[in-house]
Amino acid sequence: MSVSRETERLATYAGLLRKWNPAINLIAASTIDQIEARHIADSLHLVEIAKNAQGSWVDLGSGGGLPGIVVAIMRPDLELSMVESDQRKGAFLRNAIRELALPHAKVLCKRIEALDRLDAANLSARALAPLPQLMAYVERHLSPSGTAWLMKGRNWQAEVSQAQSDWKFDLKTHQSATDPDAAILEITGLRHA
């Protein structure tokens, strides 16, 4: 895929977010002017960090498609499933997949805990839940040999400490490209403590 095609798709996606956001609150209204500089840039940073990822990719709590749609645009070689229980947001994601011609992306419109195990090689989540709660979802849907890519805000260190009381895991942290206090957590070897 050419860089210009990817850039065009990202611009189209940003336009879709702006168009649909007033009706279904895909991203905070206060950050609508930061779609490219914050939301898409965060997701592109994840794609860069996970550039060697292979196999299936599951994005939990996809909402407006961050990072799921961006991963699908930049990594069309991956089979990507976006899990979103809100039917309206699921409709947005399906529309985005259609308009952006992303044949390897699909939407699972169910609650995370109601899905059969997905056994993902890669799993992402952004702004979904505190890490201690998120770990149960990750453990359910990530392959034992898989990697979780969790985008966390300013409290990520406290969340990691809390999660370590119930879980053991290998952790590599990557500073966010858009917020020096935020991080992308690369988690492998997840198991109960």
UniProtKB/Swiss-Prot annotation:
E.C. code: 2.1.1.170
Domain of life: Bacteria
UniProt entry tagged with the keyword Metal-binding: no
Reaction equations catalysed: guanosine(527) in 16S rRNA + S-adenosyl-L-methionine = N(7)-methylguanosine(527) in 16S rRNA + S-adenosyl-L-homocysteine
Record's keyword terms, sorted: Cytoplasm, Methyltransferase, rRNA processing, S-adenosyl-L-methionine, Transferase
Annotated localization: Cytoplasm
Single GO molecular function: rRNA (guanine-N7-)-methyltransferase activity
Record InterPro entries: rRNA_ssu_MeTfrase_G, SAM-dependent_MTases_sf
GO cellular component terms, semicolon-separated: cytosol
Binding site for S-adenosyl-L-methionine: 61, 66, 112-113, 126
Pfam family, one: GidB
Assigned protein family: Belongs to the methyltransferase superfamily. RNA methyltransferase RsmG family.
Role according to the record: Specifically methylates the N7 position of guanine in position 527 of 16S rRNA.
PANTHER family given in the database record: S-ADENOSYL-L-METHIONINE-DEPENDENT METHYLTRANSFERASES SUPERFAMILY PROTEIN (PTHR31760:SF0)
Name of the protein in its database record: Ribosomal RNA small subunit methyltransferase G
Organism: Paracoccus denitrificans (strain Pd 1222)
